[in-house]
Amino acid sequence: VVSTSLLVSVDRMGDVAEDKSSFYSNAEDYWREVPPTVDGMLGGYGSISSIDISGSKAFLRKFLGDGEGKTGKGRALDCGAGIGRISKRLLLPLFRTVDLVDVTQEFLDKARTFLGDDAKRVGNYYCCGLQEFIPEPDRYDIIWIQWVIGHLTDDHLVAFLRRCQKALRPAGLIVIKDNVSYEGVVPDDVDSSVCRDLDIVRRLVGRAGLRVVHEEQQLNFPKEIYQVHTLALR
């Protein structure tokens, strides 16, 4: 989730691509051991949750409402949802229905109670890695992808974004919010992920046939973690 790796930046995606199965299985093993709590979802940085949600809400509200190019408020998809922290505080207050997808069944089981009364507005809980997940076409107004793209290889990220584009309703929006490295690709062997720089993320977005329509840096996060940027894609 929140990458605190301070390793020297190197381009390692080539190595990862050669051993996809262990890249994914090691990540699944890591998350299986993480407690199903907000602090667990945020790598021990539970204290930043409110700042994160406030920033995301301000970002998202620029696109919601009536009028040309505005996004509907029908259904959202929370990718890498964990226990539903983002669904509970960001998506369910703004959308009628939310679907959750995560690779760890224990987190999705916890989400059913963590979401409280709002759980009745959850459409589906999908237990699946994003590299294999196929969202239903023409279903979502917002697809929210936060702190999870580092768990996908370049090719799988591009393919997933293409599937997400097909899953959008008219005027729908894909949002990526994630850590970005200062240069290149930085591997994190602890949770079996990578952190890419912004230029690489933008290039992969372009390969998926999408364009960045708005971009912001999340402010007021601890200085020791990588910068976090939010990108709206169409």
Locate each region found by the language model.
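Extreme N-terminal basic, low-complexity initiation segments
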Residues: 2-4
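Class I (Rossmann-like) S-adenosyl-L-methionine-dependent methyltransferase catalytic domain
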Residues: 6-136, 152-163, 172-234
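A conserved beta-strand element that flanks and buttresses the S-adenosyl-L-methionine
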Residues: 144
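Hydrophobic adenine-recognition pocket in adenosine-nucleotide-binding enzymes
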Residues: 148
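Short, conserved loop/helix-junction motifs that constitute active-site signature segments
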Residues: 169
